[in-house]
């Protein structure tokens, strides 16, 4: 077969090597002999041509005398390219060249397209260079193909530059070129440039269509700019562009997520009036949005309307609703929805099961959560890392850290990789159970496995070390964190300052507190409370009062903890008048005495250090 493709004055091995490198021609055998001439076969149409038929036709054309024109070969190559057999096309082009059939600009554009589709832009530009060298002038189609090639490789800036070059060369970009570039810009998040390009399209004399606007709307909605998306939607209307149900659904979903339900419902009613029928995605977005906003009856009504219109809710619809019910603490309704989807023959997916397992765990129904987990596995639905993390977290909260650890070890055997959240959950569980060594070992395992600890991970470990009397170890880690130039929020500093105060190192805590402004970190109410508490514990009541005043001057509003700490400190220091003043100020601010303050007052009443009227003042 290969021999028949080779001109008499060439060696078989050369062409065979080319075909082996550029195509998979040699893998096809048993090619049937053509009964029709190549002209008849081309005339009869070669849409969706099969590989073997294409090779057979190419052989027939090569054997014909006189040889077919480049136009005939281009028709074949173009048809094969549409079937995405790019290597085969390039092999045909090489075969043409070997048989003395010159490539014209159309042939070379086909080759450029194939190389672009294969993400081999260097080869594409090599063909373009050859075209220029042969005196051919690339047309809009050639340039559009290269623009698409740049976009496929994510090289959008170069695609933009090429379009600008086209304009300079008096080659006007066509609608496909500009739409391709707009899509590429949107994929890179460069929406503002895409919008400018749409306006430029009008200058080029093109009318943008729904395909042009689609990527821009999608990107705006994904980035949470639903207001801008709605504005663009209105602009489409002004330009008499009819939006599709997909585009309506995208904008409606974005508006629902932003809480703009009135706008979402208005758009929904608008599409209905225009005769555009809502689909399962449209309804799912609206139902989920209404339920998220607590409008359960409206959501249920829309679900009934959806079913009444024979738009069957899919697993995505049910899963979204179940998740909303679980988050709102409506586990009973979530279970009813689950039963409904089973009745309708809709198989739950991992997201569905995860939501229900999470719901059971939040209600402290660990037994039911495990039953749902077992059911999930029995139905052939594989648990993911989220499933395991939910259960591990629930075990840890129930003080069953060892069970959580057993489940954690099961993760690896299932081929799953624990993430930062999974490790954080277990490290916290061990710390809260007082199993500090286990927490430290797990932290080291996390690091050795290449799972990067987050600031939250470090915070959990530092807090555990401080609470269990290992301040020095906590300070070692804290120092390493500072040297690593990790961005430390006020939460980390609060843990260390609190640990220092608990270890009676109030002066060290004060030094760290005073250095916060130099580090560009602003103290919050917790920082002030911890520091005021430390000063009170040390007996430095005047310094605590000064810090309380500074706290208010700096615009940090005291909370009930602040007042209760100071009230107890003043009562313990025989500062009855100042205690009364603080109580009155606290009540004006809408706070009340906590259990520790009330207990202290009752104790002082019992040994007659306070009058009963003081207790009445607290109420």
UniProtKB/Swiss-Prot annotation:
Keywords: Mitochondrion, Repeat, Transit peptide. It is found in: Mitochondrion. InterPro entries: Mito_RNA-Proc/Resp (IPR051240), Pentatricopeptide_rpt (IPR002885), TPR-like_helical_dom_sf (IPR011990). The keyword RNA-binding does not apply. PPR repeats lie at residues 69-103, 104-138, 139-173, 174-208, 209-243, 244-278, 279-313, 314-348, 349-383, 384-418, 419-453, 454-488, 489-523, 524-558, 559-593. SUPFAM superfamilies: HCP-like (SSF81901). It comes from the Eukaryota. It holds the Pfam family PPR_1. GO terms for cellular component: mitochondrion. The keyword Repeat applies. PROSITE patterns: PPR. Residues 1-28 form a transit peptide. Belongs to the PPR family. P subfamily. This is Pentatricopeptide repeat-containing protein At3g22470, mitochondrial.
């Amino acid at each position: 077969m290969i021999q028949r493709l080779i001109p008499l004055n060439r060696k078989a091995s050369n062409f065979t090597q080319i075909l082996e490198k550029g195509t998979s021609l040699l893998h096809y055998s048993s090619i049937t002999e053509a009964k029709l001439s190549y002209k008849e076969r081309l005339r009869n149409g070669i849409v969706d041509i099969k590989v073997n038929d294409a090779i057979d036709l190419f052989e027939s054309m090569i054997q014909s005398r006189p040889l077919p024109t480049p136009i005939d070969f281009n028709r074949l190559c173009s048809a094969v390219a549409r079937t995405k057999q790019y290597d085969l096309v390039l092999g045909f082009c090489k075969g043409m060249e070997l048989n003395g059939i010159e490539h014209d600009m159309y042939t070379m554009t086909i080759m450029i397209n194939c190389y672009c589709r294969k993400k081999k832009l260097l080869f594409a530009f090599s063909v373009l260079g050859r075209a220029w060298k042969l005196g051919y002038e690339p047309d809009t189609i050639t340039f559009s193909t290269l623009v698409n090639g740049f976009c496929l490789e994510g090289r959008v800036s170069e695609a933009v530059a090429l379009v600008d070059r086209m304009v300079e060369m008096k080659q006007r970009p066509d609608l496909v070129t500009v739409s391709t570039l707009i899509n590429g810009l949107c994929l890179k998040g460069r929406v503002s440039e895409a919008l400018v390009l749409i306006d430029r399209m009008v200058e080029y004399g093109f009318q943008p269509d729904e395909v042009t606007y689609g990527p821009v709307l999608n990107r705006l909605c994904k980035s949470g700019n639903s207001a801008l998306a709605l504005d663009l939607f209105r602009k489409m209307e002004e330009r008499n562009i009819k939006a599709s149900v997909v585009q309506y659904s995208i904008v409606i979903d974005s508006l629902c997520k932003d809480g703009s339900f009135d706008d979402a419902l208005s758009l929904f009613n608008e599409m209905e009036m225009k005769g555009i029928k809502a689909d399962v995605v449209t309804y799912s977005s609206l139902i989920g949005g209404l339920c998220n906003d607590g409008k359960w009856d409206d959501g249920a009504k829309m679900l009934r309307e959806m079913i009444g219109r024979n738009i069957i809710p899919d697993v995505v619809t049910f899963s979204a609703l179940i998740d909303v019910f679980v988050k709102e603490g409506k586990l009973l309704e979530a279970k009813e929805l689950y039963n409904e989807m089973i009745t309708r023959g809709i198989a739950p997916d991992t997201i569905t099961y995860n939501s229900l397992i999470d719901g059971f765990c939040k209600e402290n129904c660990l037994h039911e959560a495990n039953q749902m987990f077992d059911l999930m596995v029995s139905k052939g639905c594989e648990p993911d890392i989220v499933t395991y993390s939910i259960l591990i977290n629930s075990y840890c909260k129930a003080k069953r850290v060892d069970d959580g650890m057993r489940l954690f070890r099961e993760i690896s055997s299932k081929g799953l990789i624990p993430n930062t959240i999974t490790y954080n959950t277990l490290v916290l569980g061990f710390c809260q159970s007082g199993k500090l060594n286990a927490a430290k070992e797990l932290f080291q395992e996390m690091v050795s496995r290449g799972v990067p600890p987050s600031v939250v991970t470090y915070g959990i470990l530092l807090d555990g070390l401080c609470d269990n009397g290992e301040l020095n170890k906590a300070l070692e880690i804290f120092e390493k964190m500072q040297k690593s130039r990790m961005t430390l929020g006020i939460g980390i500093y609060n843990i260390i300052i609190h640990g220092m105060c608990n270890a009676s190192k109030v002066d060290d805590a004060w030094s760290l507190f005073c250095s916060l402004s130099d580090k560009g970190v602003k103290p919050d109410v917790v920082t002030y409370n911890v520091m005021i508490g430390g000063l009170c514990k040390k007996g430095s009541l005047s310094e605590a009062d000064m810090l309380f005043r500074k706290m208010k001057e700096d615009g940090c509003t005291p909370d009930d903890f602040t007042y209760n700490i100071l009230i107890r400190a003043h009562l313990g220091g025989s500062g009855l008048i100042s205690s009364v003043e603080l109580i009155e100020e606290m009540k004006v601010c809408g706070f009340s005495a906590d259990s520790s303050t009330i207990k202290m007052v009752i104790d002082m009443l019992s040994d007659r250090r306070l009058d009963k009227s003081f207790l009445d003042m607290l109420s």
